[in-house]
């Protein structure tokens, strides 16, 4: 193990096998907090390689408590976080809109570590019981098209790194692992990454994990579609990888001069999204969520982004999404 640590401290990349060994030790709690802190910091400064990410994924995947997989097609929408923008939870809001439109979504979620509030923090604010049994969550997926898999419940091995991550308060390789460790093993995925450099390595990882179709995107410094600038996309389709750019006009939308609102607290995040889901949100955030939902439809095979965006906007402005959220919360109510 010391040889592996020395390589990291000398700014050398690990191969897949070395990374697997390292993260196997981390997942079993064999690495002290001080050592783990130095590992994560050193890897962050020099940048994590694709081989290191795959090795870590393989190590943690051996510890996952798997979710009962449906026999129908479903998708995960997730961002790496760590873009330091403190934007509202677009992916969580988009998941609810997509489910209201009939798409099957199994969202892997967690509490905020490198952001003001993670998806799990927001979901709890909407009174969604993340600690319900897998059977109950599967029921909401079957009947209401959506369920949320709370990472700590399915990834017990992450507990050994949580304290260090909270102390560091910055993005680390763990931001890159979550999107590839959904306990339901979805065949489809939309992943937002915090920097453009991660696009190609992320889509290659999805290909190696045998995803049927997936899109990885980065927009204007965020891990979401942007309506302020160019969205950079890497897509996996029929075993081939494509790279392209998207602009607001591709969604039938105009460029927004102002950038997306940022939130300073969980309560502000909740209030903004609550209003949007009730059909009372501001135009920018409505359109931003609709554009992300349009990408979800595309992954499911509905290729017309403009039609997809229009459908999503109509659903958002109807207020039906909020009713859908309430139905999900009621189905998962604690006795």
From Swiss-Prot:
HAMAP family: TrpD
Keyword flag Phosphoprotein: no
Residue numbers binding Mg(2+) 1: 91, 224
Co-factor: note: Binds 2 magnesium ions per monomer.
Signal peptide location: none
Protein name: Anthranilate phosphoribosyltransferase
Zinc-finger in keyword set: no
Summary of subunit composition and partner proteins: Homodimer.
Record-level GO cellular component terms: cytosol
Swiss-Prot/TrEMBL cofactor(s): Mg(2+)
Reported function: Catalyzes the transfer of the phosphoribosyl group of 5-phosphorylribose-1-pyrophosphate (PRPP) to anthranilate to yield N-(5'-phosphoribosyl)-anthranilate (PRA).
Residues reported to bind anthranilate 2: 165
Molecular-function annotations in GO: anthranilate phosphoribosyltransferase activity; magnesium ion binding
Binding positions (Mg(2+) 2): 223-224
Source lineage: Bacteria, Pseudomonadati, Pseudomonadota, Gammaproteobacteria, Enterobacterales
